Amino acid sequence: MSDHTLTLANGLNLGYAEYGDPRGEVAFYFHGWPSSRIQGSLFDDMAKKHCMRLICPDRPGIGLSDFQPGRTLFDWPETLTQLANHVGADNYHVIGWSGGGPYVLITALKLPKRLLSASIICGAPPLKFLGDREMFWLYRVMIQLRHYLPTVLGAVLRLGGLIAKGSPQKVPLRWLMKLLGQEDRRILNLPGIYEVVRDAALGALDRGPRSVIADADIYLNEWGFEISQINFPIHFWHGKQDRNIAWSYTERLASLIPAATSVLSDIDGHYSLPVTHAEQIIVAALQKSPSTGDAGQQDGNTGIDGELLGAVLRRQSR
């Protein structure tokens, strides 16, 4: 990993890390919540193997990036444009995991002519899509704290950071791991995987909970656009054992976007899908999307090799 900082036109610093092949096709990776640029290291090996230059910015207030008061999703395309120009990328891929998903969507809406492909892994949907029964209980609690006891939410996030520093094999983290599905627990217990997820989350908390809460507010507020306004094809990936974000949201999002594809795994969860299938996700992205000029007439021809998609998630249940 190599860390860098860019001073934006508004005078704020934007931090980012680079992974993969420095001479490869440029892809921007948008991290989840709470997370940071460090999360992109999970894709480093496969990005190198397939000649992808993976650039992972910290969102404002996270990690190396300065806090930006009052920002919305609509601020992101301009930030990304300045970063892309800085690294010399006229055209590029975008990939977002979990909380990075909405940033892929706004990029596809506002910057389609610069995109080569757009991929969302276990992506967060608009809040209006979420029903109480479908929402992860921890998110429900945090939303209530944000509305009624914001200072308590800050304390909860600090406590979460302290707990995360422990071992997933020991209490209390071992208890919390039981909230996840079997495959997610297996993946997070592999050497080095939990440490990356943990360090990425702690990187988000480096400057205190204010920035993490402000980042969450983006998801809680109205996004300011309808999903159906997006004409650029999105490649969606989701695991049916995801207990953080239900796979049904991905199906709903995909149904609203012309020529979108959705690849679902019966046995994967929120963490196991991107870690286990990083290579397939990157290969599919590099095959690029079809022209958006007649995206509504693609009739399922998405530009992703059908044999690849058919084989991606054919693992046997353990």
What residue ranges belong to the model's regions?
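Conserved acidic catalytic loop of the alpha/beta-hydrolase fold
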Residues: 75-93
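Alpha/beta-hydrolase
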Residues: 138-225
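Conserved HGGG/HGGXW glycine-rich cap/lid loop of the alpha/beta-hydrolase fold
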Residues: 12-64
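Short beta-strand/loop motif that positions the catalytic acidic residue
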Residues: 230, 236-238, 242
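Conserved hydrolase catalytic core segment
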Residues: 91-133
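Catalytic active-site module of serine/aspartate enzymes centered on a nucleophile-bearing elbow/loop
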Residues: 259-318
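Conserved alpha/beta-hydrolase "acid-adjacent" motif
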Residues: 243-249
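Short beta-to-alpha linker loops that shape the active-site pocket of alpha/beta-hydrolase fold enzymes
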Residues: 58-63, 68, 124, 268-269
